[in-house]
Amino acid sequence: MAAPLETVMTPCQRFDGRNGASATPKSLAFSIERIMAKTSEPKAAAFQPSQGLDPGAKKMLNLCSPLPCMIPIQSLAYDVHSKALLNYSELWKSSLRGSVCSPSGLCKSNCGICCKNDLNMGHTVLPGSRVIKPQVINQTVGLPTNGSLYYFNYLDSSFHPPEILSGQLLSSSLINAQSQATLSAQQKLFLLENAKLSGLAPEKFPNPQYPHKERLPGQLDQVMKENSALSADRSGKIHSKLGANSAEGKPKIFTCEVCGKVFNAHYNLTRHMPVHTGARPFVCKVCGKGFRQASTLCRHKIIHTQEKPHKCNQCGKAFNRSSTLNTHIRIHAGYKPFVCEFCGKGFHQKGNYKNHKLTHSGEKQYKCTICNKAFHQIYNLTFHMHTHNDKKPFTCGTCGKGFCRNFDLKKHVRKLHDNVSSSCSLKEISRTGQS
């Protein structure tokens, strides 16, 4: 790149048509060494927009005049593609949502968008503007062979000269050509998108020379969709997730007609209805037990596998699931996080806490159709129905008494047979000691 640059940036020579001799070369405003050196950039002059600027005319600048734009000279050896060649969606979204760059020109972090952290902070910046480092674009279509480098100045402000809005070049050009260079579609889009940072719509672009929606319909349509969505998000017009389903932004409420319980989705109400209907469509093929939900049946199947990989380190008791082990550990720790607000009784499990609260409410909505006995929960009514059907699947091995629930059987053994077995064992020990 150095060799072609030297041919372009040769000292200015003025050709005198009268005598055919070249005049004495003037001193350059800046030298090649100054451009190539990695030093602090010079201060830029303030950009004064002209009132009567013709959009169709492109101002060509030669190297013998100072640059009238507010960008510093970018070192040609610097890799600007890592910072300047950004995806438009990232660049535009950062500007709309509010980037980390302050309006005063002090960049709090090297954000990679405005690159102010690498610039000299002494530059004159327009009020409400944001200086982006000049972008070097390799242009190969429709350009002369003596150079292919352009410097662009993008101003993220409310004022954009027509040259940017029409997709033409602004600031300095290193090509000594009188015909306007043709930009590629991608580079036009890059120019137009940077102009959109100020919130201009495509229909506000004054020059109809570049029908962007015909050239790049998919990209620009996506840009406008993101523009409208993010603008609405910034102004607070987008509803929350709960309010997105309704026109007024209020969450939909599905109420159970039997118990009055409220749900935020119809699916949850459908899952709740088998509680009142008593339907248990998911039946275990091993024991025949029915469940209202398929997930409960899957958890139940672990019981029949006889696998208990989760063991308690203190008592050695094993469990099918880790959640059951965690609840069991609360017993050893004496931790009862669920406390009744009426009587102050604590519970290890939340289910036992809820069942206990029903005793204080006095509501027994589940009644037996045979004896009219009422219960707090439906599973108590289910076990009560076994008394009328004479079904007692749980039998005591000592006395042969039958029970409807395994819990009642364990309670029976603990109260009656555990004391008897312990007294019998003490008598046998005393007899062996006397003999």
Swiss-Prot record:
Annotated PROSITE patterns: ZINC_FINGER_C2H2_1, ZINC_FINGER_C2H2_2
GO cellular component: nucleus
InterPro entries: Znf_C2H2_sf, Znf_C2H2_type
Family: Belongs to the krueppel C2H2-type zinc-finger protein family.
Gene Ontology molecular function terms on file: DNA binding; zinc ion binding
Biological process terms in GO annotation: cell differentiation; nervous system development
Organism: Xenopus tropicalis
Pfam entry (one): zf-C2H2_6
Gene3D superfamilies recorded: Classic Zinc Finger
Motif Engrailed homology 1 repressor: where in chain: 27-42
PANTHER family: ZINC FINGER PROTEIN, ZINC FINGER PROTEIN 771
Designated gene of the protein: fezf2
Function summary: Transcription repressor. Component of the regulatory cascade that controls the development of dopaminergic (DA) and serotonergic (5HT) neurons.
Subcellular location: Nucleus
Keywords: Developmental protein, Differentiation, DNA-binding, Metal-binding, Neurogenesis, Nucleus, Repeat, Repressor, Transcription, Transcription regulation, Zinc, Zinc-finger
Name assigned to this protein: Fez family zinc finger protein 2
Zinc fingers (C2H2-type) by residue: 254-276, 282-304, 310-332, 338-360, 366-388, 394-417
